[in-house]
Amino acid sequence: ASRQDGQAQEAYRQAWPLARAAGIEGDGSLDLKTWSSRRALAVDSAQPDHEKTVLRLLLAALEGGREELAMAPLSRSGGAAPPSPSVLYSLQRAAAEARRGETALLVLQLLGGGTLGDDHPQALAESLAALVEVGLRTEARAIAVESLLVQSS
């Protein structure tokens, strides 16, 4: 029985970020800090920091944490360059003025250049926040889940 409990806890630890990003799991037994510490025990020490940063940004974007997005990393090793400030400003302005079509096109400009795993975390987080702001929460969550799946593979 304890072996099954251990396997269940491990499966929950692995699935938690996806469930949280999808809006399924909001008040379970894990939070970002607990998940991060458990994740650090299971994998290479450099990877959890990047995963935690990306997950923190995604959850902030989906849950309305605009101030958290301002703290986005400027670069990451082996990844994409930070997004263009002019495109980010245009995206934020379009979302603030509830221009859905323009917001969607700017998100495509930011994220449409490759796979979601290649995008800069700030571009992804700002895109999700803008989609949520114009009422496209379901689409934002779907992009967040797909991004987490791509990054975990």
What do the predicted segments below correspond to?
Residues A1-S153:
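Alpha-helical solenoid repeat scaffolds
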